[in-house]
């Protein structure tokens, strides 16, 4: 009888401990979710900031107010909502929230408008955005936000450039036909150029369409840096039609070679006079 009572007490204690651990785990999980809002939740919170920064608000017309008084406008209301939401976001994730706002604005703008902006202009826009929010809301925004944005863009460009290394190799004529002494029967032999061309097209197809222009420009920049300095001195002059023609021809070569969609407005941001090859035919580049 005593053994049965002791066993019953032990079972009751074990069940209580298990329930307590489960409750604590669930509570801690809910606490983590509350402390670390996701991307969608942050974007929902920052919607007033997106509307304000896009200048989608307009002053309210109140013709019935004849006296010269400061009239509330929809812009002022949205601005107040933006600052209120930003103040409620913890300091450690304000950078992430601001980056979400910038990304949302970029996605809503036309693709061509954003592709025609240089990297320095984007850095300047990010810096001005941070300064404006800090002054407008009289709230602390970490200084390293801009540094994180620059590092993120540099890492993205480096990753795109590494993905398209086969394209740079192919476009620079650095591939050569493979020597195959056998068989003696004349057949279409695979060449290193064709292999590199296949790798180039495969990598380019894996890059999302909205990033292909930037990726191709990164390839052009990599080729330019590898060429002798004297060859490239004074050649970056976007106003020269010949250089626009060169980058246009290179884009056409990649389009036809890979049979892949590349936005037509790609030539706008940069223009490099780079020797290009359209395709590998008959075992030669």
UniProtKB/Swiss-Prot annotation:
PTM summary from the entry reads: Contains disulfide bonds.
Q: Which UniProt keywords apply?
A: Disulfide bond, Seed storage protein, Signal, Storage protein
* SUPFAM superfamilies hit by this protein: Bifunctional inhibitor/lipid-transfer protein/seed storage 2S albumin
Signal peptide feature range: 1-18
Example GO molecular function: nutrient reservoir activity
Gene3D superfamilies, A to Z: Plant lipid-transfer and hydrophobic proteins (1.10.110.10)
Keyword Nucleus recorded: no
Identify its protein family.
Belongs to the prolamin family.
* Job description of the protein: Seed storage protein. Might be integrated via inter-chain disulfide bonds within the glutenin polymer.
PANTHER family to which the protein is assigned, alphabetical: AVENIN-LIKE B5, PROLAMIN PPROL 14P
Q: What is this protein called?
A: Avenin-like b1
Source organism of the structure: Triticum aestivum (Wheat)
């Amino acid at each position: 009888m005593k053994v049965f009572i002791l066993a019953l007490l032990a079972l009751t204690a074990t069940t209580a401990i298990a329930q307590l651990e489960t409750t604590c785990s669930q509570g801690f999980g809910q606490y983590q979710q509350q402390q670390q809002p996701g991307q969608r939740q942050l974007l929902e919170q920052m919607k007033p900031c997106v509307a304000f920064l896009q200048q989608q608000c307009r002053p309210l017309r109140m013709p019935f107010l004849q006296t010269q008084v400061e009239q509330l406008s929809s812009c002022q209301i949205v601005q107040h909502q933006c600052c209120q939401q930003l103040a409620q976001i913890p300091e450690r994730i304000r950078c992430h929230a601001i980056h979400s706002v910038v990304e949302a604005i970029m996605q809503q703008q036309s693709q061509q408008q954003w592709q025609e902006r240089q990297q320095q202009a984007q850095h300047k826009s990010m810096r001005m955005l941070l300064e404006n929010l800090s002054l407008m809301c009289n709230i602390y925004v970490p200084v390293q936000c801009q540094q994180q944005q620059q590092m993120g863009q540099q890492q993205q460009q480096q990753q795109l450039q590494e993905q398209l290394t086969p394209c740079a190799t192919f476009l620079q004529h650095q591939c050569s036909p493979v020597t195959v002494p056998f068989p003696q029967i004349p057949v279409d032999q695979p060449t290193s150029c064709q292999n590199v061309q296949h790798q180039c097209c495969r990598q380019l197809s894996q890059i999302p369409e909205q990033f292909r222009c930037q990726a191709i420009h990164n390839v052009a920049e990599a080729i330019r840096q590898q060429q002798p300095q004297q060859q490239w001195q004074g050649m970056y002059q976007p106003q020269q039609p010949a250089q626009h023609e060169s980058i246009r021809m290179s884009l056409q070569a990649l389009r036809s070679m890979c049979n892949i969609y590349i936005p037509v407005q790609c030539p706008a941001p940069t223009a490099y006079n780079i020797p290009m090859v359209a395709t590998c035919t008959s075992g030669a580049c």
